[in-house]
Amino acid sequence: MNIIDELEWRGAVNQQTDEEGLRKLVEEKKISLYCGVDPTGDSMHIGHLIPFMMMKRFQLAGHHPVILIGGATGTIGDPSGRQSERQLQTLEVVQHNVDALTAQMKKLFDFGGNSEVKMVNNYDWTHEINIIEFLRDYGKNFSINSMLAKDIVASRLDTGISFTEFTYQILQAMDFHHLYKKEDVQLQIGGSDQWGNITSGLDLIRKLEGHEAKVFGLTIPLLLKSDGTKFGKSAGGAVWLDPEKTTPFEFYQFWVNTDDRDVVKYLKYFTFLTKERIDELAVKVETEPHKREAQKVLAEEMTKFVHGEEALLQAVKITAALFSGDIKSLTADEIEQGFKEMPTFQSSKETKNIVEWLVDLGIEPSRRQAREDINNGAISMNGEKVTDVGTDVTVENSFDGRFIIIRKGKKNYSLVKLG
């Protein structure tokens, strides 16, 4: 199947400006296409990842992706999907975010050697345009009537929209025109909320370059979970690509915990597995859901893609240790990842009796209860049961002098930080 057929099979096509024309174009030649992201933060989350997964598919099919980081548009703010104005960021913050997103993109796409992938920053060409040029060369080609009719603007008319955000669609259209002229880009990909911005770009190119210009737009559907909520959030909030914000272990766990009703859809959307392999996993979901094989494959594929093989192996190791309770083989860094969301306590490094120590920290409510739990085998320290109420807790008990893990009962873990 060609790339458009594959995207449709994967459920990744929402709207196309000219399905027949685009299908014919990609069958005739390898095209250049682009997708952009504004540096509104210093990390993408997995919701941002969706259109770039489609760009990666085009790359693997031999096409030439252009990744746009919005160093200019990021200073303005995209009104799409918002009910209120964005808070303007300083140029210093925007540049910091540009650098961070650029580094993330370099991990996802191969920019080395003879790679056909390019990364551009729209600040490089936008900052040279003065206000007179903007109004004469570009503004003249936009009708206020058509701009007001765009969903991204119409939805804000009651609550209000600034002239700054109102002109965002012109800036994005300018990007498409610039890339069409300089990089021969013929297709823009974006989320479903970008339809108005994309069609503005098509209109501008045709007005400036002639109606025979072969340019196209394609949007990705809004991805919803089976319960109707928006994809991309965990109980702790957004799932980030930055390992400092969402650890590889947490990232892995997010995918492992995917609902049976969603997992096949996610395998199609997010992995590069073949149709045959995904069909096999779909059968396993129906016949052996308790094994959660599809979820494990999804988690492995995504963690490896975003964080690499080493981080995946670490996440799998932490998961296995937590499941079995055998945590002795974990390193201090793995402990920090795996127990990040557990109840956390602070302790000095001085030697102390286990009973006194548990009560002082607040893990046990009283000395009597602490002694009773120890005598009943309900207390484990770093994966080993504590059986003697006379046991002393020392730095030697810790992981690298930093952490001690207490388990009370079967599943109640506590992380104790020494310092």
From Swiss-Prot:
EC numbers on record: 6.1.1.1
Annotated motif 'KMSKS' region, positions: 230-234
Residues at which L-tyrosine binds: 34, 168, 172
UniProt: ATP binding residues: 233
Pfam families: SYY_C-terminal, tRNA-synt_1b
Role played: Catalyzes the attachment of tyrosine to tRNA(Tyr) in a two-step reaction: tyrosine is first activated by ATP to form Tyr-AMP and then transferred to the acceptor end of tRNA(Tyr).
Family: Belongs to the class-I aminoacyl-tRNA synthetase family. TyrS type 1 subfamily.
Name of this protein: Tyrosine--tRNA ligase 2
Native species: Bacillus cereus (strain ZK / E33L)
Organism phylogeny: Bacteria, Bacillati, Bacillota, Bacilli, Bacillales
Gene name for this UniProt entry: tyrS2
